[in-house]
């Protein structure tokens, strides 16, 4: 009897995604599994047919060959897998049901061996100044870490004893459990995937084989780093379990508020008070920058709130080839605590302005004109 088209068997289109193929197979496998149909030869055949179709279409290379050449394009011996019974059912379902039955994130195992886990990542928060962020900064930090226990030398067992092979999983680290109509492989509940257990734990480390310590690490903060960025130190997180890789350490940077500048990306902003005489007459003023002092000319008649841009006086960011700019926002300062002489001089000055008409205060004239038209 000629084989049916694999896509037809699973009930999916030829352009079906891997996820759609997986879902279709899962549905058919549950429907026709022999545990649900113990006396049905028809169900058994449907199950074998679905299993074979899934094995072909879930493999990228086999699927490509099948799409191009049909059944002749795939290994003719693959069909014999159906005669092997149902021993491979759990393996075929491993990628489908693995997340349902508690596969730990970051975990894995060599086939038949104990569970291996990657160590957890650590996070360290560091505050630096704006100057340190702009110019770069080398420092040292002290972070919690783990070291082999000096009493049991990392074995976790009381001196004079040693770990023994787990009697539940026989050193495999996993046990096979039956759930309903199929079986799954789980981490051994007694040894938690290690393949061994400790009859007499070390009293110093409580059987963990490691003790907490503090280690010092060198941290190089690159010039131009911004608030909230993280620096990764590979392998300096928590140690792995059963030979798994260590996690990473992430140093999160926070920049302290600055007394003069506010940062906006690669640009800097500062508020600069100037005397009203300088604003009226113009003149050169000096401003601070992260690289020292700089000066620029304020034109006569400068109004409060005017912004001046100093190119290249900002910060060169991590991904920038040139530095940002410094924006100076001038605030015209009104004098206070005047002497009698100063008051008299200002009154004379005010009188001379009034005699000159609105040409001395164009913004005031414009504002009063708008107010006048508003009430008309």
UniProtKB/Swiss-Prot annotation:
CXXCXGXG motif repeats: 149-156, 166-173, 188-195, 202-209
Zinc finger motifs (CR-type), residue ranges: 136-214
Family annotation (InterPro entries): DnaJ, DnaJ_C, DnaJ_domain, DnaJ_domain_CS, HSP40/DnaJ_pept-bd, HSP_DnaJ_Cys-rich_dom, HSP_DnaJ_Cys-rich_dom_sf, J_dom_sf
GO BP terms, alphabetized: chaperone cofactor-dependent protein refolding; DNA replication; protein refolding; response to heat
Record bears the keyword Transcription: no
GO CC, alphabetical: cytoplasm
Domain J: 5-70
Binding site for Zn(2+) 2: 166, 169, 188, 191
Subcellular location: Cytoplasm
Cofactor(s) needed for function: Zn(2+)
GO molecular function, one term: unfolded protein binding
Binding site for Zn(2+) 1: 149, 152, 202, 205
Pfam families: DnaJ, DnaJ_C, DnaJ_CXXCXGXG
Keywords on record: Chaperone, Cytoplasm, DNA replication, Metal-binding, Repeat, Stress response, Zinc, Zinc-finger
Cofactor stoichiometry and binding remark: Binds 2 Zn(2+) ions per monomer.
Known role: Participates actively in the response to hyperosmotic and heat shock by preventing the aggregation of stress-denatured proteins and by disaggregating proteins, also in an autonomous, DnaK-independent fashion. Unfolded proteins bind initially to DnaJ; upon interaction with the DnaJ-bound protein, DnaK hydrolyzes its bound ATP, resulting in the formation of a stable complex. GrpE releases ADP from DnaK; ATP binding to DnaK triggers the release of the substrate protein, thus completing the reaction cycle.
Assigned protein family: Belongs to the DnaJ family.
Record note on quaternary structure: Homodimer.
Annotated domain remarks: The J domain is necessary and sufficient to stimulate DnaK ATPase activity. Zinc center 1 plays an important role in the autonomous, DnaK-independent chaperone activity of DnaJ. Zinc center 2 is essential for interaction with DnaK and for DnaJ activity.
PANTHER family per record: CHAPERONE PROTEIN DNAJ, DNAJ HOMOLOG 1, MITOCHONDRIAL-RELATED
Identification of the protein by name: Chaperone protein DnaJ
Organism ancestry: Bacteria, Pseudomonadati, Pseudomonadota, Betaproteobacteria, Burkholderiales
Gene for this chain: dnaJ
């Amino acid at each position: 009897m000629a084989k049916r088209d694999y896509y037809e068997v699973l009930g999916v289109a030829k352009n079906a995604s891997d996820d759609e193929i997986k879902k279709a197979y899962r549905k058919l496998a549950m429907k026709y599994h022999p545990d649900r149909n113990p006396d049905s030869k028809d169900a058994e055949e449907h199950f074998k047919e679905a299993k074979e179709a899934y094995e072909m279409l879930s493999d990228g290379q086999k699927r490509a060959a099948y799409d191009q050449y049909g059944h002749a394009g795939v290994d003719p011996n693959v069909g014999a897998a159906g005669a092997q019974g149902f021993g491979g059912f759990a393996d075929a379902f491993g990628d489908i049901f693995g997340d349902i039955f508690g596969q730990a994130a970051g975990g894995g195992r060599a086939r038949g061996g104990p569970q291996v886990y990657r160590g957890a990542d650590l996070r360290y928060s560091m505050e630096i100044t704006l100057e340190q962020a702009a110019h770069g900064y080398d420092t040292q930090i002290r972070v919690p870490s783990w070291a082999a226990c000096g009493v049991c030398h990392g074995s976790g067992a009381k001196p004079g004893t040693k770990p023994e092979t787990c009697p539940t999983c026989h050193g495999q680290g996993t046990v096979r459990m039956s759930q309903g109509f199929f079986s799954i492989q789980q981490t051994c509940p007694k040894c938690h995937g290690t393949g061994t257990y400790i009859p007499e734990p070390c009293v110093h480390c409580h059987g963990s084989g490691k003790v907490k310590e503090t280690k010092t690490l060198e941290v190089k903060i690159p010039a131009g780093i911004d608030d909230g960025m993280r620096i990764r130190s590979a392998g300096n997180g928590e140690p792995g379990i059963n030979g798994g890789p260590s996690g990473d350490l992430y140093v999160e940077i926070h920049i302290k508020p600055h007394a003069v500048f506010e940062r906006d990306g690669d640009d800097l902003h500062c508020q600069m008070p100037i005397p009203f005489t300088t604003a009226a007459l113009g003149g050169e003023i000096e401003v601070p920058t992260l690289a020292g002092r700089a000066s620029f000319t304020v034109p006569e008649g400068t109004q409060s709130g005017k912004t001046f841009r100093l190119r290249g006086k900002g910060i060169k960011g991590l991904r920038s080839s040139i530095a940002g700019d410094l924006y100076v926002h001038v605030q015209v300062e009104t004098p206070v605590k005047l002497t009698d002489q100063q008051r008299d001089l200002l009154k004379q000055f005010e009188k001379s302005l009034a005699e000159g008409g609105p040409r001395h205060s164009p913004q005031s004239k414009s504002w009063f004109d708008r107010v006048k038209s508003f009430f008309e």
